[in-house]
């Protein structure tokens, strides 16, 4: 039995929720546990690799960014967990090894990707479709996320914090790749 089912059962037996609310609470608790587990596991990775500030930055940017910008999403929670951790490792650990890349190349590609996302985001995924007026809200929020990414990039550029600059750049590359993959899927069929 899943934890979410156990807690929903306890809530129903103690008359905290009605029988017709069981599935909603079970689903909500499952989502809560998955999200909390991902965040806690990510923070532990940040602590173990001595990259906690970069991990927290990653979480603060990627969680709202992926929710708003769209793009391809994994079909299962397990696949999402593995892919998310892979992206976390890439965005947090790779900048240390990429500090030799020209700031001009990174900046130029960052601007191109920002313009690309500004034009095409958000992109709906069949595994996570927009509901109701969510697309309209996501269009507005995606512009805010893109502007915030640009502001963070500029701040790290002027403060000469190359690892953080590269992390923001890698996150933008990640967002762009997931969106382009989803667009390719839509045009291929």
Predicted feature locations:
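Hydrophobic transmembrane alpha-helices
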Residues: 6-54, 64
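Membrane-helix boundary/juxtamembrane motif in polytopic membrane proteins
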Residues: 125-148
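C-terminal ends of transmembrane helices
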Residues: 62-73, 121-130, 182-186
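Structural signature of hydrophobic alpha-helical transmembrane segments
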Residues: 45-60, 105-113
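Cytoplasmic-side transmembrane-helix entry/capping segments in multi-pass membrane proteins
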Residues: 75-86, 104-110, 133-139
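Alpha-helical transmembrane segments
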Residues: 100-115, 169-173
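Hydrophobic alpha-helical transmembrane segments in multi-pass integral membrane proteins
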Residues: 91-104, 146-162
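Small-residue-rich transmembrane alpha-helices that serve as helix-helix interface/gating elements
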Residues: 166-180
């Amino acid at each position: 039995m899943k934890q979410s089912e156990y807690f929903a059962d306890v809530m129903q037996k103690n008359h905290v929720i009605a029988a017709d609310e069981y599935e909603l609470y079970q689903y909500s608790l499952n989502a809560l546990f998955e999200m909390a587990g991902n965040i806690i596991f990510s923070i532990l990775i940040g602590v173990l690799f001595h990259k906690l500030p970069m991990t927290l930055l990653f979480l603060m940017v990627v969680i709202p960014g992926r929710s708003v910008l769209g793009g391809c999403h994994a079909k299962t929670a397990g696949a999402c967990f593995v892919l998310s951790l892979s992206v976390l490792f890439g965005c947090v650990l790779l900048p240390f090894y990429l500090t030799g890349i020209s700031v001009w190349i990174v900046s130029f590609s960052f601007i191109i990707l920002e313009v690309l996302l500004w034009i095409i985001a958000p992109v709906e995924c069949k595994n996570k479709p927009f509901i109701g007026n969510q697309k309209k809200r996501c269009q507005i929020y995606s512009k805010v996320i893109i502007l915030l990414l640009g502001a963070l990039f500029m701040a790290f550029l002027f403060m000469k914090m190359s690892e953080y600059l590269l992390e923001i750049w890698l996150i933008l590359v990640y967002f762009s790749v997931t969106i382009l993959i989803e667009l390719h899927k839509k045009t291929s069929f």
